[in-house]
């Protein structure tokens, strides 16, 4: 017999679907290029905000949104592979996937902040590095995306596998926030599924993520104007 519990809070679910949509849109705008490259940059900043929010929410959000509940420690991975793991949220392999995706996205967004396309686009932090380093980071930005794409495909394959083989729908709970689990499992694990969720914590997370986006998108430069590395190089006296 099963019961329905609330497992994923609304901020977590909104983050998940907004991230999926924005990464998809970012990929499309990058491939099309041209006038859409500016939108690619805006989407990158939006994804940065989502990532910062998720990191903060991973510490102060509700129970199953917190990293401590699903971080793939060695003991958890061993228990899962031996069939002894009991839990409601992300299983250890799922937790490993989440950490890998977040880390890869962080590198992808971080390199994009300094990137350029040698035509008209420059990342918001382009002026803080010299052109050669920006070119190097641009190369990493392009390379890391291939790894990110592989992780996304693996994520989708896992969803299909769970639906087809294990008869477990992972999509519906991420839409509704609710999940059906055996009563015995509900009694064996923590039941405080919404612990920590509250408007003040949500507001704090939004303030932190918004502040970071504001800072890297020009806020820091407005408060503390700096001369770009390119301008410094041009102003340096020539040696004969």
For each feature predicted by the language model, list its residue ranges.
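Membrane-embedded alpha-helical bundles that constitute the cytochrome b-like, heme-associated redox core
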Residues: 1-240
């Amino acid at each position: 017999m099963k019961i329905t519990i609330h497992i994923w809070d609304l901020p977590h679910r909104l983050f998940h679907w907004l991230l999926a949509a924005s990464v998809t849109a970012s990929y499309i705008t990058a491939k099309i290029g041209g006038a859409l490259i500016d939108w690619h940059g805006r989407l990158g900043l939006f994804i940065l905000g989502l990532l910062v929010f998720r990191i903060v929410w991973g510490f102060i959000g509700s129970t199953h949104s917190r990293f401590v509940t699903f971080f793939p420690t060695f003991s958890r991975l061993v228990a899962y592979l031996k069939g002894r793991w009991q839990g409601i949220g992300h299983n250890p392999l799922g937790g490993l996937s989440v950490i890998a995706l977040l880390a890869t996205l962080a590198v992808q967004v971080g390199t994009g902040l300094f990137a350029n396309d040698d035509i008209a686009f420059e990342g918001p932090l382009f002026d803080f590095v010299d052109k050669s380093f920006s070119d190097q980071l641009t190369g990493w930005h392009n390379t890391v995306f291939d790894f990110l794409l592989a992780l996304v495909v693996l994520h989708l394959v896992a969803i299909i596998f769970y639906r087809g083989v294990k008869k477990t729908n992972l999509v519906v709970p991420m839409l509704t926030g609710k999940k059906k689990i055996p009563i015995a499992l509900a009694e064996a694990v923590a039941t405080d599924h919404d612990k920590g969720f509250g408007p003040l914590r949500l507001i704090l997370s939004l303030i932190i993520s918004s502040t970071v986006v504001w800072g890297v998108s020009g806020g820091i430069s407005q408060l503390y104007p700096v001369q770009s590395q390119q301008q410094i190089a041009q102003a340096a006296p020539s040696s004969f």
